[in-house]
Amino acid sequence: ADLRVLSDNSDSTTRSAGGRGFDRNLGGHAFISSINVNFANVGSMEENTTYARYVGMDAIASLNEYDMLNSDKACELRGVNQQIMAAYSNGVTPVMGTGTPVTEDADFSIKPMCCLNKMSAGVNGLSMARTGNITLAIVLADNLDALFGQVVDVNSGYELRNLRVDFKSVPDSKTPESVTMGVVNDFKSNLLSGEATISTNVAALAESVAMNFIQNQHESVPVYNSYKMENIQGLQEVQYLFNSQSNSLVSFPIRDRTEMLERFIASMQDTSHNQVSIDKYRSNAGWALGLNFDEAIDLSNNTFTVQLATTVNQNYPVNVFMYFFSRRTI
C-alpha cells in the first residue's frame, strides 16, 4: 500500500510536514486494528481485535534496532528510530539537480502476523479442499491509534492507497495433508485498583499467555503512542491461576521482576516467535508479562485468572491486553 499522513484528515493534499509518525516497531502494521481469518468449511479460524499491540509486543521481544535494517523489516516501514518514522510520514522527496522534486507517498509491504502465515513447516500449502473459500478481513486503525507525535491532534489522519493482497499458491494436492497453524486469541480488560483480578475463558487449547499494558489516559488520544508497552505503576506481584489437564489447580505467584520478564520471554518462544530473547527485550523500551503453561490447557471450560498487586487506582486506570497462543489443525 501507499501511505499518506495528513495534517488535515478532510483534505488529501495536506501532507504531514513533521511532528507526526507511527511506531517504529510496527511500521505498516500500525495501521491495522484487527484481523479476522475465516474458512468457509470450518468457520472463524482467528480473530485478533487488538492486532497492532500484538505485533508491537512481539517486536520488543524479538527485534532490536539493527533488525529493522533487514529487508523483510525495512519493506514494512519499520525503523531504527522515531526520526525515521517521521520522515516516512512526510513522504519521499527525491534529490534533484534541476527541476522541481515531487513528493511521493511512502509505500510498504507487510506480512500479516496471522494464522495464514504461521503454518507447520514441510507442508505443501493449505488445501482449498479442506478450507473452502478463505476470507481475510482487516479493519484499519483509528487515526489517533495509528499516529502519534508532538503535533498530532484530532484533525490528523492517514490514507492508504493502492492496497493489494498477494498470496502464493501451488497446484492443489489430491491427497491434502493436515496443516497445523498458530492462532492468537486476544482479550482486553483493565486495572482499576491496586489489588486486581482478571478472569477469562478462551475457546482454545492454549499453550501460553502474554499481556501488555497502557494507561487508559494514553490510549487513542493526541500526542501519545497508543501502542506503547507501558510499565505498571508500583507492580509488586503477579499470580497466574488455572487448572491443568489433570484438573489440579496450578498457581504461579511471582514477585521478582526479572523472573516476570523471563516468564514473558518463555511465553513467546514456542509460538512461531523463534527470535525472542531477554537481551533483545532489554534493548527495547517496553514492558510485558506472560506465562508458558508447559502443556496445552483447554480454557473453554477452564477459567484462566491473573491477579496483580500494584499501586494503580481508579483515577489512573490501566488497560490490559491479553494474548493466548494456541494451535489448530485443519
How would you name each of these model-derived features?
Residues A1-I330:
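Short, low-complexity Pro/Thr/Gly
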